[in-house]
Amino acid sequence: MNKQLTIKPGEIIVVKLGGSIFDNKDTTIEDVVSLQKQDKPLVLVHGGANIVTKWLNQNNAKTDFFQGERITDRAALEMVTAVLGGLVNKEIVAAINTGGGRAVGISGVDGSLIQGRIRDKNMGYVGNVVKVDQSLLTVLLESGFVPVIAPVSLHAFDRPEASPLLLNINGDTIAAEIAAAIGADKLILLTDVNGIHDESSRLLPCLSPTEAEALLASGVASGGMIPKVKACLRAVSSTATTCVIIDGRRKHALLDEVTAGGSGTTIKNTG
């Protein structure tokens, strides 16, 4: 008989697995299984932009990015849904389950988990999160599963009649909105760099929200780091959540962060 858990919001850890570290995901999967066996409630959100780009290129489809996010026309949206909601999501779930864990793969569409609207028509079908319905997450967590979430979301607000029912929303953004909605203890962003660096390329181990905002305004945080910093700012804006950006390529980076901490860049309220 499967164990039922009583989950307190402040215990939950939200993890964003960046697509750029998928070639090195073996220890991350091991860490997820290890933490689950310790009854650590985890929510895993994944990306996979590089894999989507590969499939688009194989189909001779153009793809462009703006400030670290994909401009998404209808063809790109279909590819994002198929690759992230299908292939990538199920590979991660299969790896966790065959590794001794218990995971369920979903997207932001399932249970109306992530509901959004189009952000900017120039970005195509890229959305902002308007609402998080955590009902399905609660059921999965209390049933002892790790929810593995693909960043495809429900086009629930202000949808023109001919528009798709789906939206592409950045995985960092989704992870942050979930962390904020459930009052997570920590949001951990696993990426392919060891944190945020200053203009002299020195690692910044700890930042206040004000300091992080200054890095965005000055352009020091650029490219793919922009949505990550914005995600951290969202996660810590109204909760006691701590956000950490770490190098997921490092062996057992996730396990080390949860059990000891101290690597990468931490953004938190200090007041």
Each language-model region and where it sits:
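C-terminal catalytic "cap/lid" subdomain
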Residues: 1-271
